[in-house]
Amino acid sequence: MKIFFIRHGETTGDVENRYGGDYNDHLSEKGKQQSLNLSRNLSSKGIEIIYSSPLIRAQETSITLSTQLQCEIITIPNLKERNQYGILTGMNKDEAKQKYPNEVELLKDRLNTVEKAESYEDFSKRLADAFDEIVDNSKYVAIAIVAHGGPLRVLFRDILKWGEISDLGDCAYVELEKIDKKFKLIHSEGFNRNFQIPS
C-alpha cells in the first residue's frame, strides 16, 4: 500500500497571523493555488481515495485533489489538528501576547497544555488510532490522507518513531509504502527531517 500523508495549503489565518490549531479557517488564494499545484504533481500516482480531516482548510485541499484525481473523500474526525492553543485559538498572535502572556509562554513546550486545550498525549493517541484505522482497514492500493502539520509531526515522532521534522511548509507531503507491517519512506516534500530512516 502507498500512503500519501499531506498537509493542507496556506490559510487565511496564516495570512492574518492567527493561532491555528483547530481554528476553522479557509484556504487563502495562495493556499488554493498550492493545492492545485499539488494535485497536478500527484495526478500520476494512482491515488484511489482521500481520507480528510473535517476542518475546512483540509476539506478545501481535499476537494481540489479529488477533482483532479477523480476519487472519493472520506472525512475522518480524528484527523483534525490538535486544539493546541485553547483560549488563544483564532487570536492574532500579537494581541494574544498582550492579553495572555503566560499562556503564550506555555506554548514553547508542546507538552504544556494551555487553558481549554487538548493535551499532547490525547492528541497523539487519537492520531495513532486514526492512522491505524485507515491503514489497517483500507482496501485500496494507494491512498491520500489530508490533514495538518501536527498530525504529520506525530506520524514521524510517535507513530513511526523515526524522529523530528522541521520547517514544515504548506502542502508538504510524505509518500510511504507499507510492506507487511513495516513502512518505507519513498519521497518527501516541503519539510526537513533531522534523522536517518531506519533500514
Segments (PLM) and residue ranges:
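Generic beta-sheet signal
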Residues: 3, 139-149
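Loop-to-helix element that buttresses phosphate recognition and phosphoryl-transfer chemistry
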Residues: 7-61, 115-127
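Phosphate-coordination/substrate-recognition cap region in phosphate-metabolizing enzymes
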Residues: 39-100, 104
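Short, solvent-exposed aromatic-acidic interface loops
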Residues: 186-197
